[in-house]
Amino acid sequence: MLFRSLVEAIVGLPTDMFYNTGIATYVWILSNKKSAERKGYVQLIDAGGFWQKMRKSLGSKRKEMSEAHIATVTRLFGDFTEAELVTVFDAAGQALSEPQLIAGTDTAPTAPEGGKLKRVPISRIFRNQDFGYTTITVERPLRDEAGQVVVGLKGKQKGKPQPDSALRDTENVPLAEDIQAYFEREVLPHAPDAWVDEEKSKVGYEIPFNRHFYVFEPPRNLHAIDEELKAVSANIMKMLEELTE
């Protein structure tokens, strides 16, 4: 479907949306009549945080999307634009408002002095080939007991090194990258005698949905953690002293 550019968008839904299953669910929007701007592209929309609790759960079904949530997803898809949720924090790390949806040409809020903005992507647009790869088979020569390369004796294999199945390996090369350039950069430095069996090459696609919406959270400052531990330890010691009095 990606190869034929039939996928317009993929929407990641919240978990616990269906009876007796808590697994992540995705809605694939397909079309064989894409608009010109969508041809060759796929839109990913992460609606995993768009939910509200049900008044009464049904098995594993505990969440539902409100009309407002559905309207937001519909807008993002219709606008075919990248978007993010932006939260403003003050210098003490307290959120000053609810996350604000910033899409397209919307103006993002500014952080106060000493504060910061937390940006979480909600809608992203990729080229079809960004998800594609070619699986190449990397062969290495079979060697005899003397360490000499074994070559074929008949037909098309005559005089050619024979592959050692025990040393056979595969590599996934992004579609946008030249296979030979990748091979020379990533394989030959480690295996100078290797070659690619082009007859075994296959094209595939993979969409690591969550990876494209991952936001790195830097670890807390070690000094701050150390100070908190000291404060907790001091409080515990004080409580113990009060118990022994």
Residue ranges, per PLM feature:
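A conserved structural/catalytic subdomain of Rossmann-like adenosyl-cofactor enzymes
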Residues: M1-E241
